[in-house]
Amino acid sequence: MATIPSTEGAAERRETESGALARGLNVLSRLHEAARPLSLQEIADSVGLAASTCHRLLQSLDQAGYVYREGSLYCPTPRAACPLPLEHPLNRLRRDTAPLMRELQERHGPSVLLIAFMGNHRATVDSVAGNYSVAPYFDTNVSAPLHASVSGKILLSDRTPEQRDLLLGPAPFPARTEFTIRDRAALYAELDQVRQRGWATNENENVIGICAVGTRLTAPSGRAVGAMVLTGPSRFFKKGNQAMRDDLLKSAELLNSTSHAVRAMSQFLGI
């Protein structure tokens, strides 16, 4: 007589499988972050797993085509390192925006960022480093506080007050510097202005000595798909940011009206 699996047993297997998936993704993340081949022990130490467990995960990733071995070292395959096809909307947006970003950087000096909105997440799609001695570092995952960053304000301006409340939590909002807007009414009033005018600023609100200005990239539906941002030391902003704003708005208008990548991004995001 056939044995019918118990509900508890099926749930336990699902939990085990999801745990293995999370550990495998963590291993891939460490390989990407290292930017060099890693030994089994290096990977195991970095993810906090026993070498035997890590070895089984790497074998599974190898069989699935996500890692390969170079002697005793492990490396990500092209499938893992470059998962997006060349014609993916994010890659198309990067290519369409690159000449405009270089022109903005050369004209004004600060770094230029192209940021995409994926739900309530922000991703740096491309960057052009500014003209200053300290090389800036921009992570793919944008973690700057929503209420104290240009990309965050543009994203929040695209949300309802109720959605903003869920994203920000209760006021007063955390202070990053003495210039951070912490009051709910003051911040929401600024966000409404950002929505109307299409651009946002950060004047020493996240890091003292760093300012930024940026404009939204807009889907045909009117929703924001991302932002273009000029950011750098406050000395670039001593004479104000109107010239930067004007050029950013022109660049965004050009992309919004002519770039098929912006339309493709709106389809990709479902907005």
List the model feature ranges, each with a label:
Residues 106-107, 204-209:
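Short loop/turn motifs at secondary-structure junctions and domain boundaries
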Residues 30, 95-107, 113, 193, ...:
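Amphipathic alpha-helical regulatory segments at dimerization interfaces
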Residues 208-216:
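A short beta-strand signature within small-molecule sensing/ligand-binding domains used
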Residues 76-170:
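Amphipathic alpha-helical effector-binding/dimerization core
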